[in-house]
Amino acid sequence: MAGAYETKQYRNVFAEYGYSEEEIEKRVQETFETIFHGSEEERFYHEAGEDMGFMEDTGNHDARTEGMSYGMMVCVQLDKKEEFDRLWKWTRTYMYMDEGPGKNYFAWSCALDGTRNADGPAPDGEEYFAMALFFASRRWGDGEGIFNYSREAKAILHECVHKGEPGHPGDPMWEPSNKLIKFVPGLDFSDPSYHLPHFYELFAEYADEEDRKFWKGAAEASRAYLHKACHPDTGLSAEYADYDGTPHSAHQEIFGRHDWYYSCLLYTSDAA
């Protein structure tokens, strides 16, 4: 069955439940304004200086690549270029690592003043950054420097695939032998909530030509993996899972603690 990307027919479940287009749009815009420009008690986007901004993780009082990339995705979907560029510049200024084993990846957590809390990445941030940047390129066109969105996206994905090859130190974010995303580059197991096969289908169209076959294979591998990693009755996934889909016993061999709802949302998004 062809999905929305092929048919150009995008479902609106709110409309299917009887809400008018005006009601839906009003609620979306009100929610954006609350999160990005509401009162100090409500919003978790904050401007920093003249041209940067960050998304605060309110439970941990830091900024994470996960939240920054989600914020960028919201902005590009809603045509909010100023906020998008502010988030991306903050990310590139404070989170981007230019040396060490994580060179060209992004530190997964920073304090709200930009000080790094970590020297390693979390791959879900990189994949969302890349997709948001590709969308920005297609919506607004490429600019200069770090705002050459498509170039930045391709560079991120190149690192994710090719680290660990001769002359390219470090570890890739996708395991080359099975094309599955890792929990972190240096460990050999996955996180079901990271799997975005619908993103990988688009990476197979937008990424560097040499890597497009890889991304097509990653989409197929990811879909097969989710069938193994999600419980057959509940649909819940473990926090972490080995490459065969079984819960990763060395860490958290449990279902439905933190990230199970991500997996549910992601595989339903892929189906759409």
List where the protein language model places each region:
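Conserved small/polar residues in nucleotide/adenosyl-binding loops
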Residues: 267-272
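Aromatic-rich carbohydrate-recognition surfaces in CAZymes
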Residues: 61-68, 116-141
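Penicillin-binding protein/beta-lactamase superfamily catalytic region
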Residues: 252-260
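Ligand-binding pocket segment of bilobal, Venus flytrap-like solute-binding proteins
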Residues: 261-266
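Low-complexity, Ser/Thr/Pro/Gly-enriched N-terminal "stalk/linker" regions
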Residues: 1-66, 77-112, 116, 168-176, ...
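Aromatic- and glycine-enriched pocket-lining scaffold segments that form the walls
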Residues: 134-233
